[in-house]
């Protein structure tokens, strides 16, 4: 019978990995406010979607519904660290952009595109909800607001 081989524990080789400092993601917020009747009345029960990505691949980040004051709570969203704005050689934007869509029965759908969100700050999006004419059951189109990205 063959003699068993001695068992010897060999530690795995140590890998030399050069770590590059990574910016820790930060948090910024979006708060949605909905009004109607020429800003005279808050609109409760409005569905809110916060998305990002491209037309081909949209990522749902958050959903909410407005309260009796016509507002959502502050919606936390991942954004780059504010320290990016301190480096003049940095090519990445020191903020993220999100699309905010609002839906309510009897009103036109609206979307605010490319809403900039910065670390530690709240971007307030105010929507003036427009009622549908009585002969329409569904809105024929979505009202789109294009935001201009900050020139930093």
Task: Show where each model-derived region lies.
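Short beta-strand edge segments in extracellular beta-sheet folds
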Residues: 114-120, 128-132
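Hydrophobic beta-strand segments
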Residues: 46-53, 100
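Beta-strand-rich domain onsets/edges
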Residues: 1-42, 58, 64, 137, ...
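Short, acidic Ser/Thr/Gly-rich low-complexity loop/linker segments typical of extracellular
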Residues: 56-86
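A generic structural motif
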Residues: 49, 79, 115-116
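Short strand-edge motifs at loop-to-beta-strand transitions and within beta-strands
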Residues: 72-73, 113, 123-125
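A short, solvent-exposed loop/turn motif at the edges and junctions
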Residues: 86-114
